[in-house]
Curated annotation (Swiss-Prot):
HAMAP family: GTPase_Obg
Binding annotation for Mg(2+): S178, T198
Stated name of the protein: GTPase Obg
Annotated region (Disordered), positions in chain: 21-43, 439-484
Names of required cofactors: Mg(2+)
Organism in which the protein naturally occurs: Mycobacterium tuberculosis (strain CDC 1551 / Oshkosh)
BP-aspect Gene Ontology terms: ribosome biogenesis
Function as written in the Swiss-Prot or TrEMBL entry: An essential GTPase which binds GTP, GDP and possibly (p)ppGpp with moderate affinity, with high nucleotide exchange rates and a fairly low GTP hydrolysis rate. Plays a role in control of the cell cycle, stress response, ribosome biogenesis and in those bacteria that undergo differentiation, in morphogenesis control.
Compositional bias (Basic and acidic residues): 456-473
Composition-biased stretches (Basic residues): 474-484
Pfam families: DUF1967, GTP1_OBG, MMR_HSR1
One GO cellular component, as annotated: cytoplasm
Main location: cytoplasm
Amino acid sequence: MKGSSVPRFVDRVVIHTRAGSGGNGCASVHREKFKPLGGPDGGNGGRGGSIVFVVDPQVHTLLDFHFRPHLTAASGKHGMGNNRDGAAGADLEVKVPEGTVVLDENGRLLADLVGAGTRFEAAAGGRGGLGNAALASRVRKAPGFALLGEKGQSRDLTLELKTVADVGLVGFPSAGKSSLVSAISAAKPKIADYPFTTLVPNLGVVSAGEHAFTVADVPGLIPGASRGRGLGLDFLRHIERCAVLVHVVDCATAEPGRDPISDIDALETELACYTPTLQGDAALGDLAARPRAVVLNKIDVPEARELAEFVRDDIAQRGWPVFCVSTATRENLQPLIFGLSQMISDYNAARPVAVPRRPVIRPIPVDDSGFTVEPDGHGGFVVSGARPERWIDQTNFDNDEAVGYLADRLARLGVEEELLRLGARSGCAVTIGEMTFDWEPQTPAGEPVAMSGRGTDPRLDSNKRVGAAERKAARSRRREHGDG
């Protein structure tokens, strides 16, 4: 029985994140001997755990997400009496390789994670609900309700790994890119004499005197790669960060219609069809404007050496440095190494100095102060907005006082006024979030509460405590009865 093949290198995954929900607040009254009417003492719910990506230099692939695409953080604990707050849910820290790019469902760039220890909050945990002690105020002395915890953020994200390298090697299959990486660095990629030997990017560290740089070898391109031929353009994401692009050309190929000039032109056409994901500060500029160099490979073959010398000047007229090398005999590898090192230095020196950024990157904040009210086409209305929808999630609809508190909040926000302006009548259906209810202006919160105002207790306003004179008279009556 053959087992299914397991990929060793994964550079693009879709994951599903769900942060922890906040704990519910507690509605309780302080109970202690000789302390009647102790007042509310319900604690707040704990914050839900967030999902945080952390760059780890020891991680080099997104393979773990291929097997475990669902990430869930712990929820917060509920509040308790005696002013005890619930424990916060633990954050789920997930290790990702350097160069990971986070995209939302619409393909919008959320974060470009570069640098060991860089953190990104992928999904925020829900806030804990307030207990009745926190809801107490001058006019609401004894709330008989608490708020529910908010739901944690849940969303689907796409993770793409874009290799962090200084030099990117591009070329046709079997042009000798992997052999070049192996010859100038300590990397040991798979090398064989057939097309598409390289199926995953290979990285190598190259020493150039006192300096060092990294080289990325991506799978070979062929004409039509932008239309999906061969391995397509998927692996070109790994050269988006490269400061220098190097065309590796096979001068010893015997394929009809192939020559160094046409190979370079075909590759440039495919590169022009590629649309980078990184934009703005995260990008190094358009690939078309990136510095180029050309490596004419396999000059250990006599015919290849003649061809390389013949086309060298024509290629140099484009303003690109040209290196004629042989990875088999290691001829001219040192000039190539130091030439690439100088190109990297010149390119980095010409770039503007990057402004240091905070190590923690967060999604774009959303203004939750507004709302909209629209007719639903069936005689009802739909209220949309982050704040009213969050209030709905916080409300325990089994508690009349909590429902009344929700009505007060919506009225203060202006929802009731807007409904009246649009012609809403008592009893019409109003939908907020996932809840649909019959709307009543200033909905009462229960008969006992309505008599003395929401969140108050008539017992607190009365004064039925026995005074000293009354206690003295009572003792006198007891003594008289005892003597009789």
